[in-house]
Amino acid sequence: MTDDNKGTKFDPKEGCSQWCILEAECSDNSLDGDLEKLFEEGTDTEISDLIDDEDIIQGNSRELLCQQESEESEQQIQLLKRKYLSSQEVLQLSPRLQSITISPQHKSKRRLFERDSGLELSFNEAEDLTQQTLEVQEVSATGSVPAEQGVKGLGIVKDLLKCSNVKAMLLAKFKEAFGVGYMDLTRQYKSSKTCCRDWVVTLYAVQDELIESSKQLLLQHCAYIWLQHMSPMCLYLLCFNVGKSRETVSRLLMNILQVAEVQMLAEPPKLRSMLSALFWYKGSMNPNVYAHGEYPEWILTQTMINHQTAQATQFDLSTMIQFAYDNEYLQEDEIAYHYAKLADTDANARAFLQHNSQARFVKECAIMVRHYKRGEMKEMSISTWVHRKLLVVEGDGHWSDIVKFIRYQDINFIRFLDIFKSFLHNKPKKNCILIHGPPDTGKSMFTMSLIKVLKGKVLSFANCRSNFWLQPLADTKLALIDDVTFVCWDYIDQYLRNGLDGNVVCLDLKHRAPCQIKFPPLLLTSNIDVMKEDKYRYLHSRIQSFAFPNKFPFDNNNMPQFRLTDQSWKSFFERLWHQLDLSDQEEEGDDGQSQRTFQCTAREPNGHL
């Protein structure tokens, strides 16, 4: 019995359905008894064309292969998506579930919890769906978004490093973006450790979000901020509250803007350039420029009308002389340096810096100040001189340190005080004191401390070859020659007897005619006791001698046991003021009230002091 439904069902593809696979049917009739009949019938058969010997047509087998490969590729892509991408439901789960992973997954930013339903959510539903669709498409096309952002900055740095000259490339980008050269706005600092309050910084390829955040983060550091972003360059003018070096500024901006040092140029601005000041001033009016704080003084000076008027003021030499006189600047280098420092606040100092004859003005100013000081000194008595010099000494000391040291050297203090009184008043043949003794007894320390507090002058016999080595005697109330040797004693014995007598002598001065003066009180220190030298017997009556036989004592910390300081001498003079016959300053007009100093410039009645 046969079954018509028997056979193997096969779903052939298109192009392969010209034949079918058939299975032989089973029959109960056995052929064992019909073998003779089979042989008798011969080779003839009722089935014809059982085997097709014709050429086979190719059909659509190639298209089938392409479809199979496409399906296999889609399956592999789906497996990769399941591995590296998460569905929207997974993105909304708690962060704790994500931490339970075998390998790290790079996901886009997600919410911590499910969004609550509400009216606002329904309004934004269409926008959210559109945004989700765009996010999925972007992720599927480019891979992981955070990974791309992470390598963006590194790619920029690599591009810069590929340049043979990074600075030249940044300068070209800057000029292309802002239309002006970076070096036209700045002055160059060779050292990165030099400090300045104002800095011009330009950066390449900074993210917009970080630029916006820097506007708030820099407020605590800067008094004035000027910011303009012209992609890909960003320009800052930062006026810090305190001076900073290039290294400090670079580290600050690298932390705030997340940039590398190769993306940055930092130099101080040109403070005296009109074009540079106008660039910052007019740029602050641009709506695309962020400016916060008051304009720096150097911008106002060159842009505002009132500052321009002040800048046009002619230089007044008398104002400069008055400044040097009031501050007791007698040397040319001191006058030039300290007056130039006033250029930020003083119009006359600013005019001085803009003048082409600064060296001549400084020289003339120093000459005039010395003339005024010399005239003032000659008018003063020794009491007024000592009083003026002690007023500038600050701090407390004790007069006993001076007295103890004198007694330590086995000197009668009453005798010393009497001779010192005559010495200060410059009495004839009493105006020279010699302190002699072996080395390390404190001779130079004692005399130098006195010269320092009374602003005396020191003469060096090494300059005796010059005709002008005694010239400082004309500009002081007290002088010192330290470490007098036999050669110096010979010179004193031959040429300075009249001066030690207290008589008027002719003193040769450099670049001036010789002048008539009396020697001021003169201190001498020596290892030679001139009183025991018979060949200098003519000096015995002109010199008052004290011996320092004992070595100066020091404590265990190598500190002097006797403090011969300015404060000690101030206390000494104040304590023994009347014993030294120094006049009362109230009688000379100094009653403790502030007095008008010497005026060498024409001041306005209501002008500044």
UniProtKB/Swiss-Prot annotation:
It is found in: Host nucleus. The modification Phosphoserine is found at S87, S94. GO terms for cellular component: host cell nucleus. GO terms for biological process: DNA replication. A motif (Nuclear localization signal) lies at residues 81-83. Keywords: ATP-binding, DNA replication, DNA-binding, Early protein, Helicase, Host nucleus, Hydrolase, Isomerase, Isopeptide bond, Nucleotide-binding, Phosphoprotein, Ubl conjugation. Pfam families: PPV_E1_C, PPV_E1_DBD, PPV_E1_N. Its EC number is 5.6.2.4. Its main location: host cell. It comes from the Viruses. Phosphorylated. It is an enzyme of class 5 (isomerase). One of its GO terms (molecular function) is ATP binding. It catalyses: Couples ATP hydrolysis with the unwinding of duplex DNA by translocating in the 3'-5' direction; ATP + H2O = ADP + phosphate + H(+). InterPro entries: Helicase_SF3_DNA-vir, P-loop_NTPase, PPV_DNA_helicase_E1_C, PPV_DNA_helicase_E1_N, PPV_E1_DBD, PPV_E1_DBD_sf, Rep_E1_papillomaV, Znf_lg_T-Ag_D1_dom_sf. Belongs to the papillomaviridae E1 protein family. ATP-dependent DNA 3'-5' helicase required for initiation of viral DNA replication. It forms a complex with the viral E2 protein. The E1-E2 complex binds to the replication origin which contains binding sites for both proteins. During the initial step, a dimer of E1 interacts with a dimer of protein E2 leading to a complex that binds the viral origin of replication with high specificity. Then, a second dimer of E1 displaces the E2 dimer in an ATP-dependent manner to form the E1 tetramer. Can form hexamers. Interacts with E2 protein; this interaction increases E1 DNA binding specificity. Interacts with host DNA polymerase subunit POLA2. Interacts with host single stranded DNA-binding protein RPA1. Interacts with host TOP1; this interaction stimulates the enzymatic activity of TOP1. This is Replication protein E1. It comes from Human papillomavirus 17. The lineage of its organism: Viruses, Monodnaviria, Shotokuvirae, Cossaviricota, Papovaviricetes. The gene is E1.
